[in-house]
């Protein structure tokens, strides 16, 4: 994980750690001239590792985004940002996207009152995301909300930390997308 961060730069969804400033110097010395192929490959790898996707999943999302109206890149980022695991991360219910995936896989999360155990579930506007009523589920979310740095919440999401409830208001705006891709 840390090799990926040193190579690609900060990936907030993968881990809370940041690369040291000295590693940038090493990369600059080693890099030389960056080819167009290398730039595209690094940007693709950033997407894969940040959102925790396999190559096949990413290709499916690119295919869906290509069919949709609008800029393929913007539609792709909107699709990835509207995944359930990413929304839990943005709400602060999990400290990282892999942590959010684990919450979903272990059936701690309800969407509109139903258990959802698929991290790639595509959330829609007006979806209500809550935790199970079990004490263990609420404790996991409470620890994450308490320990997470209180960053500004994107305007397409609202959270009620006392009821452990989040709401998807609308499809994400392009200015709120967390990962900067070239």
UniProtKB/Swiss-Prot annotation:
One of its GO terms (biological process) is translation. InterPro entries: Ribosomal_uS4 (IPR022801), Ribosomal_uS4_bac-type (IPR005709), Ribosomal_uS4_CS (IPR018079), Ribosomal_uS4_N (IPR001912), S4_RNA-bd (IPR002942), S4_RNA-bd_sf (IPR036986). Part of the 30S ribosomal subunit. Contacts protein S5. The interaction surface between S4 and S5 is involved in control of translational fidelity. One of the primary rRNA binding proteins, it binds directly to 16S rRNA where it nucleates assembly of the body of the 30S subunit. With S5 and S12 plays an important role in translational accuracy. Residues 82-143 form the S4 RNA-binding domain. GO terms for molecular function: rRNA binding; structural constituent of ribosome. One of its GO terms (cellular component) is small ribosomal subunit. Coiled coil: none annotated. It holds the Pfam family Ribosomal_S4. Belongs to the universal ribosomal protein uS4 family. This is Small ribosomal subunit protein uS4c. It comes from Libertia formosa. It is found in: Plastid, Chloroplast. It comes from the Eukaryota. PROSITE patterns: RIBOSOMAL_S4, S4. The gene is rps4.
């Amino acid at each position: 994980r840390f090799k990926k961060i040193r190579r690609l730069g900060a990936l907030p969804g993968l881990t809370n750690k940041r690369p040291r400033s000295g590693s940038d110097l090493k990369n600059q010395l080693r890099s030389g001239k960056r080819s167009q192929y290398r730039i595209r490959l690094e940007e693709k790898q950033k997407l894969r590792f940040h959102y925790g996707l396999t190559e096949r999943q990413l290709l499916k999302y690119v295919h869906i985004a290509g069919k949709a109206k609008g800029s393929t890149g913007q539609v792709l980022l909107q699709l990835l940002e509207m995944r359930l695991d990413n929304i839990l991360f943005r709400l602060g219910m999990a400290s990282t996207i892999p942590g959010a995936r684990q919450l979903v896989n272990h059936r701690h999360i309800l969407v509109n009152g139903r258990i959802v155990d698929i991290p790639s579930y595509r959330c829609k506007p007006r979806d209500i995301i809550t935790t199970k009523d079990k004490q263990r589920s609420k404790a996991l979310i409470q620890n994450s909300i308490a320990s997470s740095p209180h960053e500004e919440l994107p305007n397409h999401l609202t959270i009620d930390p006392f009821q452990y409830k989040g709401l998807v208001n609308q499809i994400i705006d392009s200015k709120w997308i967390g990962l900067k891709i070239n």
